[in-house]
Amino acid sequence: MFASCFNINGTNFILALCIIFVPTIKLYIQIIMRCVYANGINKRSTPFSHNRNPKIFKVYLNERSCIIVRIW
């Protein structure tokens, strides 16, 4: 019975999922690309030093922005 109801309303259900999830997926892809780009800039501008003080960058994904934390 559940399968028959799902087949009848499957197109509407899938359409609703696409309407809800596609903008959020696009937003997360933009945030991830921004984080990767910013992390790449930081690694290029400040390369890993060979002395006792290495520079390590950690990228934390937030819902709205990308937070890059430098750990000494």
UniProtKB/Swiss-Prot annotation:
Family matches, as InterPro entries: DUF5433
Pfam families: DUF5433 (PF17498)
Name of this chain's protein: Uncharacterized 8.4 kDa protein
